């Protein structure tokens, strides 16, 4: 079993795990899970990718998933925007992650695209698997 940590974002806990890697000019990876998933469902895929590329990575569970805090209210049609524009930037700031390569599946891919399209902070790139477009 892979040990997860928790970090406070806006007064609520988010489950996460940092996969260590060498200091590199290459961007760190951030894995964004699908709509019915959580960090644990990525299994060892992030570890293998980070190791093969030689970079650190972040895997986390959004609010309401895995061992992160539950939702405070029912989701609205803008929940992907809230994750992309509020929660993800706060998490990246707290963990000191700048200009990541975002890797998202389904909801996670949509969050990555919305986050990057906002232009609020630079990303190194996006791998978007089955986004809602």
Residue spans for each PLM region:
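Short, hydrophobic alpha-helix immediately C-terminal to the catalytic nucleophile
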Residues: 43, 89, 113-117
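Glycine-rich, phosphate-binding/catalytic loops in enzymes
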Residues: 45-50, 74-77, 119-120
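Conserved phosphate-coordination/catalytic loops
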Residues: 10, 36, 78-82
């Amino acid at each position: 079993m892979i040990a997860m940590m928790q970090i406070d974002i806006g007064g609520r806990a988010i489950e996460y795990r940092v996969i260590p890697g060498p200091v590199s000019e290459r961007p760190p990876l951030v894995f964004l899970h699908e709509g019915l998933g959580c960090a644990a469902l990525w299994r060892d895929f992030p570890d293998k990718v980070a190791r093969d590329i030689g970079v650190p990575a972040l895997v986390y569970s959004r609010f309401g998933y895995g061992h992160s805090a539950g939702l405070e209210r029912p989701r609205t049609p803008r929940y992907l925007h809230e994750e992309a524009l509020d929660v993800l930037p706060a998490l990246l700031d707290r963990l000191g992650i700048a200009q990541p390569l975002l890797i998202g599946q389904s909801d996670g891919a949509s969050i990555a695209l919305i986050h990057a399209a906002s232009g609020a902070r630079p990303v190194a790139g996006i791998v978007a698997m089955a986004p809602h477009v």
